[in-house]
């Protein structure tokens, strides 16, 4: 698998975990989404012509982190 395909797959897995977390309120899914997005960002950062994807994934990661912080504040 090429790095680009791996990063795309990691991003897709992160998006799926994020969607499930919003429906189930399971923190472990948010943590998994964050890890997937972070991995995808690292790879996209190394590839040429992927700045836009990196930016979109970083925004998704920020949303996940905000939800995790909200959960910590509520506890």
Which role fits each region the language model picked out?
Residues 4-19, 52-67:
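Conserved alpha-helical positions within TPR/SEL1-like repeat arrays
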Residues 1, 18-32, 67-75:
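Short coil/turn connectors between adjacent alpha-helices in alpha-solenoid helical repeat scaffolds
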């Amino acid at each position: 698998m090429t790095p680009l395909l791996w990063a795309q797959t990691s991003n897709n897995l992160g998006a799926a975990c994020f969607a499930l977390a919003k429906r189930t309120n399971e923190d472990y899914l948010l943590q998994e989404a964050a890890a997937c997005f972070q991995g995808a960002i690292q790879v996209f950062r190394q590839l040429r012509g992927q700045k836009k994807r990196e930016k979109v994934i970083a925004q998704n990661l920020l949303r996940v982190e905000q939800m995790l912080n909200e959960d910590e504040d509520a506890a």
